[in-house]
């Protein structure tokens, strides 16, 4: 393998701010004083958006009489959309509709700096924040005057999340210990725990002499047993329901065979282990493979070679095994690897910042960073060639697949804990061709019109025109506390008898993409006991008596109309059965009462329209800032728990902190949106700094979440970070070695439908950030690695 240097930019991985900064263009301009502070937000997470709105409302309530109020300017398209919007306004010198603040990544400071539009927070007290999380300001290109230009108000890092049951199957099968279906049944009946080698001649060895490896293997076994319990329980319930005689039989009470049951379930999708050269044949497994990139990629490559369902599948469908290792952020993983290979020293990285300018001579002259990239790429290429690497394709996050046992482990943001695991009833929507999306939160089923009962007319009016124009209906529940259609009320996600609230919020599987970065877990909309409202979907026109945006939506997309009408006309398999297919292991008896026919779904969850199955439609007034979509041509599928990953079956480790085990320094990425100031005019600049100082330093009273929750007293910055599963890098947090920060480790049970869970990702993030704050770990920030012209690998 060799490198060929060329003028190819890592499109999508790196920006152009540093290159533009090198041109030295200046063009500072003032904006019109409009008497208010505008905060630009492109947050896609409901929890973060809701928290930010509450912060704005709080400030406007407690601010001084003469202080400028603050309002949110919503920008579509996630952080990339926010970046594009800011660059456009800078380029056209927008003096009337620009904003004062933006929540985004600090590379935007370079964009502002090249035209002198950056705003230093020299009137804001930042002494409560740990210094190590502010020093990236010294490495921002296009900024010559030292100062604080970006304040990290919502930090996250990355973790390695291991699917315990899947990894157990991989290691156990490579040891020759995975029993066949018949032998598993026989050992269960006899009480024997014996296994066979299944033709494995040189089995994998687990280095149990190493204490860390021994401990990890025991943990992996326990996770497999947890998964096996679900399988055993499901089978016993099925047997009991199908035969009264079975109810009197003695069932096994120990869990000695649960791990085998788990392996058997995983084998159905992963296939059988193949003993091949360069695979896991005669391989010695150690816990240290997860501590450095070189060994992790090598081990992953060996696993991929050992399973034909991975290495021979060149046309993966959404329901297939996607690989061994999943990576949500390609630039994060690639550049962190290279940074670690350079000893965690920016002098050995792609660029150096001197006097506000980025110097890329180290890379251009084929120096240390070039050589390190060459080594790192070689490791990645091996895994790519064996088809074992899954990368996020515009929103198809690893957790979408890992929670369905389609990956062995993945590297993802700590802000995504409540996205990463399946609920009690794990549902997804399948499309033709094997593609799917996880069942989004904030979703309602659309029902076909019932003849002679749902015309949409006023007071029972059932005119022919109204009946012909009615496509379907769905129901929403408004909170009892709702004061008006535009108030803080929200809708309860529901489809038939099941709720989408316990599912994660709309992350797209293979085929259609999700918007924005991966963010925080979904929150359940609405409350029990709310007022139920029927919403009518019409084509052509909305009849009198119905109000657009209140209880009616007009569908003018012909494809949607045709799909809804086609679904409504389809013959049911049985009279009274929904066309939705429920693939449930624990089946329920079919009700004799006629059920309404489901012909589609509508959601305000964060799913991306593909204009094939998912389309944008008009939203309701109660949807507030969240866009509504319609989903057609989907089949709902409910999976057995043994086919899904629960949080208690995962092993959460730090993402690899070294390139090779012999490296001296550990490296951890720090990421997350900063609050960034923009020059407007003298008066508004002062008002902007006043708000930011209040945001960071003024404790306020906040209502607790859920029944019985007490009010809390904290700053707006703390409230925002904790509400969104982020971490505010306060010195006091890192000094509390084993204490849990209120709100950051627990999530209200309504936000995920699975009761209270310890946020394993946040706990790991706090551990890593403490290491950074005490200089035990080197922090890497990708947000200022911009405009690098790099080579093509060949």
From Swiss-Prot:
Superkingdom as given in the UniProt entry: Bacteria
Residue stretches of biased makeup (Polar residues): 182-200, 245-261, 511-526, 577-593
GO cellular component terms listed in the entry, alphabetical order: plasma membrane
Lipid attachment points (N-palmitoyl cysteine): 23
Key words, A-Z: Cell membrane, Lipoprotein, Membrane, Palmitate, Signal
Lipid addition sites, S-diacylglycerol cysteine: 23
UniProt topology in membrane: Lipid-anchor
Localization annotation: Cell membrane
InterPro entries: Lipoprotein_10_C, Mycoplasma_lipoprotein_cen_dom
Basic and acidic residues: bias regions: 567-576, 737-751
Keyword Signal: yes
Keyword Signal: yes
Biased composition range(s): Low complexity: 475-501
Signal peptide annotation: 1-22
Region: Disordered, residue numbers: 182-208, 222-261, 474-529, 566-594, 737-757
Family note: Belongs to the MG185/MG260 family.
Protein name per its UniProtKB record: Uncharacterized lipoprotein MPN_152
């Amino acid at each position: 393998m060799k490198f060929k240097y060329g003028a190819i930019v890592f499109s999508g991985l790196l920006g152009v701010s540093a290159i533009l900064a090198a041109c030295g263009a200046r063009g500072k301009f003032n904006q019109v004083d409009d008497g208010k502070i505008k905060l630009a937000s492109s947050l896609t997470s409901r929890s973060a958006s809701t928290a930010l709105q509450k912060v704005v409302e709080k400030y406007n309530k407690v601010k001084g009489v003469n202080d400028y109020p603050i309002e949110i300017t919503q920008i579509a398209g996630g952080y990339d959309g926010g970046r594009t919007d800011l660059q456009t306004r800078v380029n056209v010198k927008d003096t009337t509709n620009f904003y004062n603040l933006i929540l985004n990544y600090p590379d935007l400071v370079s964009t502002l700096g090249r035209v002198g539009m950056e705003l230093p927070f020299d009137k804001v007290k930042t002494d409560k924040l740990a210094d190590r999380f502010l020093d990236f300001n010294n490495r921002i290109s296009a900024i010559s005057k030292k100062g604080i230009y970006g304040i990290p108000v919502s930090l996250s890092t990355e973790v390695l999340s291991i699917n315990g049951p899947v990894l157990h199957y991989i290691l156990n099968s490579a040891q020759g210990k995975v029993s066949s279906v018949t032998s598993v049944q026989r050992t269960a009946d006899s009480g024997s725990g014996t296994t066979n080698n299944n033709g494995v001649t040189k089995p994998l060895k687990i280095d149990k002499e190493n204490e860390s490896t021994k401990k990890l293997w025991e943990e992996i076994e326990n996770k497999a047993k947890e998964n096996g319990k679900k399988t055993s329980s499901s089978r016993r319930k099925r047997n009991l329901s199908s035969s009264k005689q079975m109810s009197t039989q003695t069932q096994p009470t120990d869990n000695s065979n649960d791990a085998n049951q788990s392996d058997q379930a995983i084998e159905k999708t992963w296939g059988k282990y193949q003993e091949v050269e360069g695979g896991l044949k005669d391989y010695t497994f150690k816990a240290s493979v997860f501590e450095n990139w070189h060994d992790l990629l090598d081990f992953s490559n060996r696993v991929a070679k050992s399973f034909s369902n991975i290495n021979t599948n060149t046309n993966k469908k959404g329901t297939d095994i996607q690989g061994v290792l999943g990576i949500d952020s390609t630039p994060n993983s690639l550049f962190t690897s290279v940074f670690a290979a350079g000893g965690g020293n920016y002098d050995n990285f792609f660029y150096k910042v001197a006097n506000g300018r980025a110097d890329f001579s180290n890379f251009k002259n084929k120096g240390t960073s070039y050589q390190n990239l060459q080594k790192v790429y070689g490791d990645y290429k091996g895994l790519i060639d064996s088809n074992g690497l899954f990368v996020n394709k515009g929103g198809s996050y690893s957790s979408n697949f890992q929670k369905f046992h389609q990956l062995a482990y993945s590297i993802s943001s700590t802000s995504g804990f409540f996205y990463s695991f399946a609920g009690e009833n794990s549902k997804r929507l399948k499309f033709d061709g094997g593609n799917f999306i996880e069942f989004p939160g904030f979703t309602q089923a659309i029902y076909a019109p019932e003849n002679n009962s749902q015309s949409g007319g006023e007071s029972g009016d059932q005119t022919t025109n109204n009946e012909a124009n009615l496509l379907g209906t769905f129901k929403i529940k408004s909170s009892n506390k709702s004061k008006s259609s535009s108030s803080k009320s929200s809708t309860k996600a529901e489809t038939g008898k099941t709720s989408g609230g316990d599912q994660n919020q709309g992350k797209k599987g293979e085929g259609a993409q999700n918007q924005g970065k991966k963010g925080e877990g979904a929150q359940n909309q609405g409350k029990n006991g709310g007022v139920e409202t029927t919403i009518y979907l019409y084509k052509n026109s909305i009849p009198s008596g119905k109000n657009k945006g209140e209880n009616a939506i007009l569908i003018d997309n012909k494809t949607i109309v045709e799909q809804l009408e086609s679904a409504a006309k389809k013959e049911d398999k049985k009279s009274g059965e929904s066309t939705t297919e429920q693939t449930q292991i624990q089946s329920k008896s079919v009700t004799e009462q006629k059920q309404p026919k489901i012909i589609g779904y509508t959601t305000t969850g964060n799913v991306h329209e593909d204009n094939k199955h998912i389309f944008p439609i008009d939203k309701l007034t109660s949807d507030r800032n969240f866009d509504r979509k319609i989903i057609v041509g989907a089949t709902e599928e409910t999976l057995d728990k043994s086919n899904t990953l629960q949080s208690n079956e995962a092993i959460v480790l730090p993402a690899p902190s070294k390139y090779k085990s012999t490296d001296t320094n550990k490296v951890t990425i720090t990421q997350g949106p900063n609050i960034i100031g923009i020059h407007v005019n003298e008066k508004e600049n002062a008002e902007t700094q006043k708000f930011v100082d209040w945001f960071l330093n003024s404790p306020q009273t906040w209502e607790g979440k859920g029944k019985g929750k007490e009010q809390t007293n904290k700053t707006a910055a703390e409230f925002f970070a904790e509400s969104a599963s982020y971490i505010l890098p306060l010195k006091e947090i890192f000094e509390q070695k084993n204490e849990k920060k209120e709100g950051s480790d627990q999530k209200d049970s309504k936000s995920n439908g699975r009761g209270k869970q310890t946020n394993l990702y946040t706990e790991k993030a706090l551990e890593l950030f403490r290491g950074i704050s005490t200089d035990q770990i080197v922090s890497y920030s990708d947000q200022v690695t911009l405009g690098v012209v790099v080579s093509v690998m060949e």
